[in-house]
């Protein structure tokens, strides 16, 4: 928990007013959790570990910084529901990729926890998104301009989301070019929620691609 809290405070000190963390990748001692560790109903030991990490971060950043939990679809709907119910008292902004991205599973996690569900980096077209919207299975979409068909298609997806009162956080963890494209799109839609700024964007090999620092 102390490591998570320290890194969270560092991000806030750099000026970020929202942070996103995967609390279920690293084991307390060393190494990473494997897929089987995060599937099905979780043990009390894992639940206590997860809550301790979330609690430490919330206490470190205070009540006015948005906290997003990210699961990368490593958990399934059952374990995600357990985790969401456990930590929703810490004012979670939204729950990203809590399970394999299907409308039915996303709706299950949302209904069980009451948390806003974010999904989209593995959803690619209007025809896939529409089923999420119809079932109220997603509250924040995360289409990637580089994988969903470009600026025109992503704009259509965002406009469709607006009809269903669904917000947008463009998935942006690629090159400076994809970051710039995401920012241009976000300025042109009414349902923009938050801009994602990945640590990869600050890597020297990415910054060297740019004439101007960003």
Can you describe what each PLM-predicted range is?
Residues 85, 91-94, 100-214:
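Shared catalytic-loop signature of beta/alpha-barrel
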């Amino acid at each position: 928990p102390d490591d998570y809290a320290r890194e969270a405070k560092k991000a806030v000190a750099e000026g970020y007013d929202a942070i996103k963390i995967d609390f279920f990748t690293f084991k307390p001692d060393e190494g990473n959790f494997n897929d089987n560790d995060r599937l099905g109903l979780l043990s009390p030991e894992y639940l206590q570990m997860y809550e301790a990490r979330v609690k430490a971060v919330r206490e470190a950043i205070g009540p006015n910084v948005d906290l997003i939990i990210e699961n990368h679809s490593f958990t399934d709907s059952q374990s995600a529901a357990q985790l969401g119910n456990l930590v929703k008292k810490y004012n979670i902004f939204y729950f990203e990729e809590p399970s394999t991205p299907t409308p039915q599973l996303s709706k299950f996690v949302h209904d069980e926890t009451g948390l806003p569900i974010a999904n989209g980096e593995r959803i690619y077209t209007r025809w896939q998104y529409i089923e999420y919207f119809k079932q109220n299975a997603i509250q924040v979409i995360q289409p990637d301009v580089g994988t969903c068909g470009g600026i025109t298609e992503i704009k259509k997806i965002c406009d469709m989301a607006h009809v269903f009162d669904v917000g947008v956080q463009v998935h942006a963890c690629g090159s400076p070019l994809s970051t710039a494209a995401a920012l241009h799109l976000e300025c042109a839609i009414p349902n923009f929620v938050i801009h994602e700024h990945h640590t990869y964007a600050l890597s020297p090999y990415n910054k060297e691609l740019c004439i101007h620092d960003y």
